[in-house]
């Protein structure tokens, strides 16, 4: 389903009624979780830029050869490179497609979009947030001023100008975004899917409410008693969640707030490699770091113990000091 297609409230309610929202254990393996994402689905990705990216699940989707996905995220980083370069996504919907704050716009994205085999659909950052929020609210659109008069307007015919019935002012109506599945990485959750997020939540709460199903990857699975001791930290409730995967360092080489910072040596080497040659550089990276390892633990070993320990030291120090 194209990312611009808006579903009716009746359809959303019908889909919601079909979901199993019972309090049950939902723990599955990384391989099983990736199997829940089917070819051609619209996939919402949690986190932002290089923060709490569900990299382990993206890694597994590439390994399983998923195809023709339309992926949406508030800001895309090297995850977008891998989704395009690994042949998983045909379209990425976002507000900024960069390899990270330090390295600027993605040359991998530019290569594929200019070649015409992939699509990059650009919205403003606020528009992405309001699209997920509209999806979570079950309304077909929300009004914003962002993008009015900008160069994005001619590129986004899906957004409609509208005269406010109360003030007469021009507003822009952005269509709801209801992904088939959301993949979100969190610091901790219980086996039922009650997820707690430390630090910035980005658009993850609205994304979880908007999606037809939710897969959580988590640094660790904790007891329900621990979740209940800090109920104010629970941002995504169990009734939204369909599967839970425990994946330590599941956002690597990106960061997970309070636990580890980005693994910069690995990131810098990656960027240098793919920027030198977006096709062959990406192929070499995928062969070594995605298709080569037997499992996620082996991928982490390729990053190296020294870098992981240093990223963990920095992450915990910044959180606690």
What does each model-identified segment do?
Residues 1-321:
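Conserved alpha/beta enzyme-core scaffold
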């Amino acid at each position: 389903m194209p990312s611009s297609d808006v579903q009716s409230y009746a359809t959303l309610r019908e889909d919601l009624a079909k979901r199993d929202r019972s309090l049950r254990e939902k723990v599955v393996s990384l391989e099983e979780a990736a199997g829940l994402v089917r070819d051609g689905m619209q996939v919402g990705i949690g986190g932002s830029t290089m923060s709490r990216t569900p990299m382990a699940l993206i890694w597994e989707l590439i390994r399983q050869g998923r195809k023709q996905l339309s992926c949406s995220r508030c800001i895309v980083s090297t995850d977008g490179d891998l989704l395009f370069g690994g042949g998983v996504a045909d379209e990425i919907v976002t507000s900024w497609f960069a390899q990270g704050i330090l390295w600027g716009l993605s040359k991998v994205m530019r290569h594929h979009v200019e070649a015409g085999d992939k699509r990059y659909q650009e919205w403003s950052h606020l528009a992405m947030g309001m699209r997920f929020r509209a999806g979570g609210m079950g309304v077909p659109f929300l009004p914003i001023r962002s993008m009015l008069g900008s160069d994005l307007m001619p590129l986004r015919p899906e957004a409609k100008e509208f005269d406010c019935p109360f003030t007469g002012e021009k507003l822009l109506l952005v269509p709801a975004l209801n992904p088939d599945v959301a993949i979100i990485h969190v610091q901790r959750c219980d086996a039922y899917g009650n997820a707690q997020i430390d630090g910035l939540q980005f658009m993850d709460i609205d994304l979880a409410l908007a999606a037809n199903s939710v897969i959580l990857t988590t640094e660790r699975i904790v007891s329900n008693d621990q979740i209940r001791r800090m109920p104010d930290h629970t941002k995504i409730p169990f009734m939204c969640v369909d599967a839970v995967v425990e994946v330590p360092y599941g956002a690597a080489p990106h960061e997970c707030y309070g636990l580890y910072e980005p693994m910069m040596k690995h990131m810098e080497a990656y960027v240098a490699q793919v920027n030198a040659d977006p096709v062959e550089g990406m192929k070499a990276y995928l062969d070594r770091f995605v298709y080569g390892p037997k499992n996620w633990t082996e991928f982490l070993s390729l990053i190296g113990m020294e870098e992981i320990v240093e990223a963990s030291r920095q992450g915990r120090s910044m959180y606690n000091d």
